[in-house]
């Protein structure tokens, strides 16, 4: 953790939720809530892809909120196959980012959870940016991205992802006409490519509508 990282606990729907809040230098652009990969396969808020997403947001002026899903780390409760996890995410938005600019991001299972959080929040809550990485479309019913958010959404997938095949992500995106940034040779965890991942996310965050 760096000097601008705070550890928080928030009372959630299934008990306490463990949160890390990373703050940027100066005035922030808003809050970004970042969801981690599958808890039953070792996913936590300390996952390297999740940390990379947080760094990209912080370096672009956002407060990054990482959290452990229910039953992970110090977060209470039990794994709920994405349903309760989406409730946790929405609860954190209400508690820690109730107003102002909001961005949502997720990796793998976290992208699945984030897709349903977007579905629940839109259009009542404006979502400034969305980032979905290694979206677990082969394993879960990922919600479509509302057409109004396509220009504000970055979907990244590794060409050589052997956890979530690229074809499944394409099958999810194709009916929506939603572009995917395909990383040549990229694995599910973007081994050796995390600096490039951060660069692509930063470029998305710095783009103006």
Question: Which residues does each predicted region cover?
Answer:
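Active-site nucleophile loop of the alpha/beta-hydrolase fold
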Residues: 37-38, 131-140
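Short beta-strand immediately N-terminal to the catalytic nucleophile in serine-hydrolase-like folds
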Residues: 104-106, 133
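Conserved loop-alpha-helix segment in the C-terminal half of the alpha/beta-hydrolase fold
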Residues: 159-178
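Acidic catalytic loop of the alpha/beta-hydrolase fold
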Residues: 138-139, 159-164, 188-189
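Gly/Ala-rich beta-loop-alpha elbow adjacent to hydrolase catalytic centers
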Residues: 106-114
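Short beta-strand/loop motif that positions the catalytic acidic residue
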Residues: 149-150, 155-157, 161
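Serine-hydrolase catalytic machinery in alpha/beta-hydrolase-like enzymes
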Residues: 10-12, 16-99
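Catalytic histidine-centered segment of alpha/beta-hydrolase-like enzymes
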Residues: 186-198
């Amino acid at each position: 953790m760096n000097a601008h990282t705070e550890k928080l606990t928030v009372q959630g729907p299934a008990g306490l939720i463990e949160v890390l809040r990373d703050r940027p230098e100066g005035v922030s652009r808003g809050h970004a809530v970042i969801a981690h990969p599958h808890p039953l396969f070792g996913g936590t808020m300390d996952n390297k892809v999740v940390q990379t997403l947080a760094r990209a947001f912080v370096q672009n002026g956002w407060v990054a909120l990482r959290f452990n899903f229910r039953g992970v780390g110090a977060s209470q409760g039990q794994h709920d196959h994405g349903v309760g996890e989406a409730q946790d995410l929405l609860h954190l938005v209400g508690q820690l980012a109730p107003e102002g600019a909001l961005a949502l991001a997720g990796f793998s299972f976290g992208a699945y959870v984030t897709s349903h959080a977007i579905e629940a929040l839109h259009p009542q809550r404006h979502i400034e940016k969305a980032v979905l990485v290694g979206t677990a479309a082969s394993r879960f019913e990922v919600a479509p991205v509302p057409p109004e958010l396509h220009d504000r959404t970055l979907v990244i997938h590794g060409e050589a992802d052997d956890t979530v095949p690229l074809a499944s992500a394409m099958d999810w995106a194709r009916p929506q006409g939603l572009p995917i940034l395909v990383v040549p040779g990229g694995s599910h965890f973007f081994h050796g490519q995390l600096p490039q991942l951060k660069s692509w996310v930063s470029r998305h965050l710095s783009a103006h509508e």
